[in-house]
Amino acid sequence: MELLIKLITFLLFSMPAITSSQYLGNNLLTSRKIFLKQEEISSYAVVFDAGSTGSRIHVYHFNQNLDLLHIGKGVEYYNKITPGLSSYANNPEQAAKSLIPLLEQAEDVVPDDLQPKTPVRLGATAGLRLLNGDASEKILQSVRDMLSNRSTFNVQPDAVSIIDGTQEGSYLWVTVNYALGNLGKKYTKTVGVIDLGGGSVQMAYAVSKKTAKNAPKVADGDDPYIKKVVLKGIPYDLYVHSYLHFGREASRAEILKLTPRSPNPCLLAGFNGIYTYSGEEFKATAYTSGANFNKCKNTIRKALKLNYPCPYQNCTFGGIWNGGGGNGQKNLFASSSFFYLPEDTGMVDASTPNFILRPVDIETKAKEACALNFEDAKSTYPFLDKKNVASYVCMDLIYQYVLLVDGFGLDPLQKITSGKEIEYQDAIVEAAWPLGNAVEAISALPKFERLMYFV
């Protein structure tokens, strides 16, 4: 018996090497195909968000169903730097170089063998949109050159661009509804979004086919009010509009423009300075008596052009169609400064990723803030003081209230979810447009079905 075992062992080691699939037949071959298929259609995406106040990197990992996979303990790698690309208007090469630390971080996250197949995109938002002349294009070209020469990622010809406000709003709508698990459901089950950035504010929500069909036509060259997007096989009609010059930082300039030679009723007693935005300077002087809530509110209403002629049945401000309202707007998610300002003024705990907010809550906080003088505001709101914007706390709070109630027509008591992050499975994702952009980038890869595309 011992001799027989030795003979069998000898024969086994003497046989030519064979693969496990050959040896075990179709069973292992089938399971190996499944493994390879999962590996092949799992993919990373890298998105740069070049905003008006800073640049951010987002890295995502998707499976074949377009679900997020873990990167470490979370489902998103994220980091940011300041200042934004628009700060390098006169030095485009330095603008591109400023992104290299973020690029290197992304390269550390994505496995080396997957980097050539990983799409990378950069979307520049309102900050670059507001630059004069060809300054923005020079910066973008420098970034293209840097990525092509320096990066091992998949850089497509259209990978680096200025994304317009409607794209920004559309991508954010996808991000929020993706994270909440609403994609593939009826439009009435989706959530509308409002994003108050630095240079612009966007609103996006799904509407009925009837509303979309009857949407007003726009002038040549203007963005249409309705964007059609297919997500997981379900077509959605999105009302999207971006209001350039009405982001948090840009709106201050619009408000101060109205008082070039006189004090501004939105500024706190004891403040006298110059506000600089997008290369322009604006006088910022307070009345000796300080801010006046009602006068400030009226000044902001003028800045929003609420009395501008409305050629449609219903408008927001500046003669812009409001999208008709409806169930797609019934539930709203507000992001960016709609979260950061309440956070910085103590309306919410800093560790909270999102919370319920009503416009009337902002109004109440505004009345408190406007009663302070500049020195008291600095001590009351240390986070704003650290950012050197405590002088504008009254203005910013009233602006948000007027924007929501008078601009977008919301009830002062309407409950809105305001957040910087959204729970996704056992992790969180940032409530921002890059995830929606990444979903589109992944869907464009040949190995994925077209799970998301704009019509």
UniProtKB/Swiss-Prot annotation:
Transmembrane regions: none
InterPro entries listed in its UniProt record: GDA1_CD39_NTPase
Protein name: Nucleoside-triphosphatase
Keyword list, A-Z: Hydrolase, mRNA transport, Nucleus, Transport
GO biological process, one term: mRNA transport
Main location: nucleus
Top-level class of the enzyme under EC nomenclature: hydrolase
Taxon lineage: Eukaryota, Viridiplantae, Streptophyta, Embryophyta, Tracheophyta
Residues of the active site: 168
EC id: 3.6.1.15
GO molecular function, one term: ribonucleoside triphosphate phosphatase activity
